[in-house]
Amino acid sequence: MEAATADGFRPRFWGGVNLGSTTPGHLPGEVAATRADYNRWIWEMGRLGVSTVRVYTILRPSFYDALRAYDLGHPDRPIRLIQGVWIPEDEWLSTGDAYAPAVTNGFKAEIADAVGVVHGSTDLPERPGHASGSYRSNVAPWLLAWSIGVEWDQKAVKSTDRLEAGRPAFRGRYFTSAEGSTPMESWIASMLDYTASLEAGRGWSMPLTFTNWLTTDPLAHPYEPLHREDAVSIDAMHIAATQAWPGGFFASYHAYPYYPDFLRRTPRYANAADPYSVYLRDLRRHHRGQAVMITEFGVPTGIGVAHRGPLGRDQGAHTELEAGSMDADMLRDIRRDGYAGGMLFEWLDEWFKFTWNTWDLEQPAERRALWRNALTTEEQFGLIAADTRGQAASGGRVIAGADAGVQEVRASHDEDYLYLRLRFDRPGSWRSSPVTVGFDVRPGENRGLPGTRGADPAADVALRIGSGDSAQLLQAAWTDPIAWQYGIARRFVPMHRAHLEQGSGVWDSPRLILNRPTLIRPEHRVYPTELVDVGTFP
């Protein structure tokens, strides 16, 4: 992709980052970031050499004010903008038809608002879940591209194609869809055409794209175990810009190395030295003659994990250094394999996010944004970590006095963790004489802490510190959510009913489920449930 410079148009690889709409402690619709936040973040992006920032929706005026101020002050290395526009997803999912007036008209209104925002020529009234204010900062000179849409829901795509079957291909002034295009593809072409018409009316033309992801990619994946992850396709090769739109059109994808499962079950990928790169080359080959950008990629940090990926590129359980190294490797893959750019997900941790294997236990869901769950991987993608840095750990109140070599126990907490400070008679004594701390979290007993003769029978969670520098978190077996959710309810994991009796006296280590049993049809093979221990700390 090329961008205008003082010397004319110049092609380059665009390395950038995605920026969300809010800050920890807030839901996305609250768009809580301030001008000071944006000033700091954009300056830090510039220091890192970020060439592009992608946003998903309209942000507060202060974002565009900060971006324009930075770019005016750095004409030799401005940060370009990819502006996203969300589809009215609730209306689309409820109607199952992108052509429904509530969806199409609502999306056009969002696009029109976004165009006015980018050109600094609109005022948006207050509306729940949306940014508002007076937009007077024109950032159009630094607009690299428009990216409209969302990660398309498979069922709603399939429903749209069924309900609108027989629709002719779209023929607009600026964008068209090919003969044989699906109704969903033609609808996307019409929305791109509408976006282009608004920009053309202002005398502008720039690259346009729509959001896509591996679930609706145009390739066939017979080794994908979940039918819904390969049920429908949306193919950017069926959409084209006309000569009336010199800004052009490109394909874009959210592409992660750990999901869907075809990335590690397809022999062509699984047996390769770098499965992610082989997939990227297959996808790039399909889009021959068309520019393609990876607009989301990355791996999260934290102690939780939600899915396994080839080469250890799992969805979680990485240190900051490990994640950074993997992200850098993938960015090199993206560049080497002929893509126009790669946008890392994401700039800042987002606490409101959820992960499939923990969200049932994060109750009430509307309070998820108020605290950080170390086991929820979607909260840990940020290039900038949004954590409390353990400041509360240094204080706390005394909750237990002298006992068995421990002088006192202090407890404190913050939005991240519960902190315990144990003061020992002999510093480091736990390395040779392990200490067990019990917690009474819920009603009921479990016959005493593990490794004791009935000490603290009310405890249902135990933390064993030592020997050495290891630690082990244990839970009463009858409180194990995995056993109840995936053993009793679904029979995905083995379990002993006697252990699940309240007060059974059995202890086990907390686990997360990473995959349910999966059938790979070409192999006629069922892969068993995948679990990971999250209670052992070496």
Segments the model singles out, each with a brief description of its role:
Residues A32, R54-D65, T215-L219, P225, ...:
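Acidic-and-aromatic substrate-binding clefts and catalytic sites of carbohydrate-active enzymes
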Residues A102, G106, S159-S186, G304-T319:
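A solvent-exposed, charged loop/short amphipathic helix patch at secondary-structure junctions
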Residues P88-E89, L93, D97-Y99, D113-T182, ...:
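Active-site groove signature of glycoside hydrolases
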Residues M1-L72:
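Active-site-adjacent substrate/metal-binding segments within catalytic domains
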Residues R389-P538:
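Surface-exposed extracytoplasmic segments
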